[in-house]
């Protein structure tokens, strides 16, 4: 189902002090943008922002870059992030929100940004063979991520899709990533520190298991 147009979204985003209108201008300078040397985590496809809002408000010593493509969803993410910080009475200074096509992620990040962790949560599985190169875990994308992931940087990947998960294991191997942790049922695995996304809650209620892995960049 397509999200309805939200005429308020773009003006509200542009007046928001943590929304980056032109992320390309910060390429290689994201630590300067945050004005500190804290680790930077990147969420690809942040949706309505629930995941990054929880992470950011719970981890003030980590910086977060949250990316999606549509103003409508980013507008909701902006509001959810603000709400989470307000409820905890915390200052919002460790999240940057922006619109960016993930296939062109190298236009806004490079090796000087030294991203410590990437989150990929319930991305489009692109099941048709002709579309598989669009997957966010495809080897073509992993090659881009390697450019700005620091040494031993991590990718945390969650999905409900069995085929995507199995084929992603091969992508990570081809892309020179080591699988550090894997489970085919995250919610019964005993793994600590999981933050559920909107999709994750929905799938869990439907009895669909969440597959999860942590991949480490190898030289």
Curated annotation (Swiss-Prot):
- Tell me which InterPro entries the record gives: SAM-dependent_MTases_sf (IPR029063), tRNA_(Gua-N-7)_MeTrfase_Trmb (IPR003358), tRNA_methyltr_TrmB_bact (IPR055361)
The disulfide bonds in this chain are none
Task: Provide GO CC annotations from the record.
Answer: tRNA methyltransferase complex
The Gene Ontology terms for molecular function here are: tRNA (guanine(46)-N7)-methyltransferase activity
As recorded in UniProt, its EC number(s) are 2.1.1.33
Name the pathway it acts in. Answer: tRNA modification; N(7)-methylguanine-tRNA biosynthesis
Q: Which residues bind S-adenosyl-L-methionine?
A: 43, 68, 101, 124
> Which residues participate in substrate binding?
128, 160
What catalytic activity is recorded?
guanosine(46) in tRNA + S-adenosyl-L-methionine = N(7)-methylguanosine(46) in tRNA + S-adenosyl-L-homocysteine
Alphabetized UniProt keyword annotations:
Methyltransferase, S-adenosyl-L-methionine, Transferase, tRNA processing
Q: State the source organism's domain of life.
A: Bacteria
Function (record text): Catalyzes the formation of N(7)-methylguanine at position 46 (m7G46) in tRNA.
Family, as annotated:
Belongs to the class I-like SAM-binding methyltransferase superfamily. TrmB family.
Protein's recorded name:
tRNA (guanine-N(7)-)-methyltransferase
Q: Which organism is it from?
A: Clostridium botulinum (strain Alaska E43 / Type E3)
């Amino acid at each position: 189902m397509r999200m309805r147009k939200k005429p308020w979204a773009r003006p509200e985003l542009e007046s928001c002090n943590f929304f980056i209108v032109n992320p390309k201008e910060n390429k290689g300078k994201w630590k300067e943008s945050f004005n500190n040397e804290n680790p930077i985590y990147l969420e690809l496809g942040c949706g309505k922002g629930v995941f990054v809002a929880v992470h950011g408000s719970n981890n003030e010593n980590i910086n977060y870059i949250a990316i999606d493509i549509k103003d409508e969803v980013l507008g909701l993410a902006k509001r959810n992030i603000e709400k989470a910080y307000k409820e905890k009475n915390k200052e919002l200074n460790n999240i940057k929100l922006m619109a960016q096509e993930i296939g062109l992620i190298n236009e806004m990040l490079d090796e000087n940004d030294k991203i410590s962790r990437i989150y990929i949560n319930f991305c489009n599985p692109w099941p048709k063979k002709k579309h598989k190169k669009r997957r966010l875990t495809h080897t073509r994308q992993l090659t881009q991520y390697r450019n700005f992931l620091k040494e031993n940087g991590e990718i945390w990947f969650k999905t409900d899709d069995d085929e995507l998960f199995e084929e992603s294991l091969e992508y990570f191997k081809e892309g020179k990533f080591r699988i550090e942790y894997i489970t085919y049922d995250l919610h019964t695995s005993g793994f600590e520190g999981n933050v559920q996304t909107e999709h994750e809650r929905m799938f869990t209620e439907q009895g669909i298991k969440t597959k999860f892995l942590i991949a480490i960049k190898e030289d």
